Design a protein with these regions (language model features):
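Single conserved hydrophobic/aromatic residue that forms the stacking wall/gate
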Residues: 1-21
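Rossmann-like flavin
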Residues: 19-71
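A glycine-rich dinucleotide-binding beta-alpha-beta segment and adjacent secondary-structure elements
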Residues: 51-65, 220-228, 281-343
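Helical element adjacent to the flavin cofactor pocket in flavoenzyme catalytic cores
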Residues: 78-129
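Mid-domain catalytic core of redox enzymes
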Residues: 120-239
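Active-site-proximal substrate-binding core of FAD-dependent oxidoreductases
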Residues: 124, 363-366
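C-terminal segments that line or cap access tunnels to active or ligand-binding sites in enzymes
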Residues: 189-299
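A conserved FAD-binding loop/helix module that cradles the flavin
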Residues: 339-361
Length: 366
């Protein structure tokens, strides 16, 4: 199993490298066929593992980047090789500290950061982006524009569907979006030392639950949870003798027309009850503070289409060159970073998209 995963890892440049044309896809096609890239991750895992619990444990990784293990290409099984070779890292201070350090780096480089200014429009002229217009109607001109907004939102709303390339029109029209996320953040006034930093809590169903989430867009009574306890590694996430957690639950995106104002409070109770009955005794009594995010929050705060948690799903037809390109096909000075472009979602994927941009921009400098 791990040998085959490592073989997929040898095609890592296809997944993370610079994609200026479709050539890498075609160059690697014989290898992809040989590695049975047409199989799903679950099919690949099932070739080697027979017990249903093991199949679940070794096939859930696509969910961490927004994909259904039953239709995500088995190329993504390379995640096993990546984690086995380099391990799993956690930044002291969490993702917020990564953002803080990037902000400090930008300031050291003389980059001016403007906050609380929503971009309403990208102004274009022929084959160039002239600048942006904010919510106050102010125009700002730029030589190059890098957008980390969702590419579909960038194209359909900020630029306008009639002013984008044919490739982006097809990506937008045919897009299969990732699932939504329900995230419950909570602190406890006691420590749960038995809980590891990362825990995956599996519900009674697997394939049928994923079908409810990805295909039927219905909110089921059962669920699975990724439980994150950063205090296991960084005690500064909570006061002394306290703990900090978030419980992340895959749910349907907003194509499901779920009334989250009604469902969210009930969903919170269900999550707490499930954890309390299995691994966190008296949890309801120990929670001292909590809040949650639903797909509605992702839509309103991050402008992600349908409130999806990871932009578009990592299907084969939405991977590498088939995603929105890092360099726009029509506008010579417009570039994309983030979960919706190449290589994809997750902190490693997003940071790799920035590395791709770092290599691309010099190719198009005046």
């Amino acid at each position: 199993f791990f040998f085959s995963s490592r073989r997929r890892h040898t095609r890592y440049p296809l997944v993370t490298g610079v994609q200026t044309c479709a050539l890498p896809i075609f160059r690697y096609t014989p290898d992809i066929i040989k590695l049975k890239g047409y199989q799903s991750v679950y099919q690949f895992v099932s070739t080697y593992l027979k017990h249903p619990n093991l199949r679940q444990a070794f096939s859930i990784q696509p969910l961490l980047v927004g994909g259904n293990p039953f239709n995500t290409t088995s190329i993504y099984a390379l995640i096993h090789a990546l984690e086995k070779k380099w391990g799993v890292f956690f930044a002291q201070g969490g993702t917020g500290e990564i953002v803080s350090q990037l902000k400090m780096l930008m300031e050291r480089k003389g980059i001016n950061i403007v906050l609380n200014s929503e971009i309403k429009k990208i102004i274009t002229s022929k084959q160039r982006v002239e600048g942006i217009e904010n919510s106050n109607g102010d125009f700002h001109k730029f030589d190059y524009l890098i957008t980390n907004a969702d590419p579909i939102y960038t194209n359909n709303v900020l630029i306008g569907n009639k002013k984008i390339s044919l490739h982006n029109k097809l990506v937008n029209k045919l897009a299969k979006h990732s699932m939504g996320l329900f995230v419950l953040f909570f602190g406890t006034k006691v420590k749960y030392e038995n809980i590891a930093h990362h825990t995956i809590w599996m519900g009674p169903r697997y394939k049928d639950l994923l079908s409810d989430i990805f295909d039927k867009h219905t909110l089921a009574e059962d669920f699975s949870i990724y439980l994150h306890r950063p205090t296991a590694t960084d005690p500064n996430f909570a006061p002394a003798n306290c703990d900090s957690f978030y419980a992340l639950v895959p749910v349907p995106n907003l194509k499901g027309n779920i009334l989250w104002d009604n469902e969210a409070p009930l969903f919170v109770k269900s999550i707490i009850k499930a954890l309390e009955q299995t691994m966190m005794p008296k949890l309801a009594q120990t929670i001292c503070d909590s809040f949650y995010m639903t797909p509605e929050n992702f839509l309103q705060e991050y402008n992600t289409p349908y409130g999806s948690g990871f932009s578009i799903a990592p299907l084969f037809r939405q991977s590498a060159w088939f995603r929105t390109h890092n360099k726009d096909d029509l506008y010579q000075n417009l570039f994309y970073v983030g979960a919706g472009t190449h290589p994809g979602a997750g902190v490693p994927g997003v940071l790799n998209s920035a590395k791709v941009i770092d290599k691309l921009i010099p190719l198009y400098e005046k």
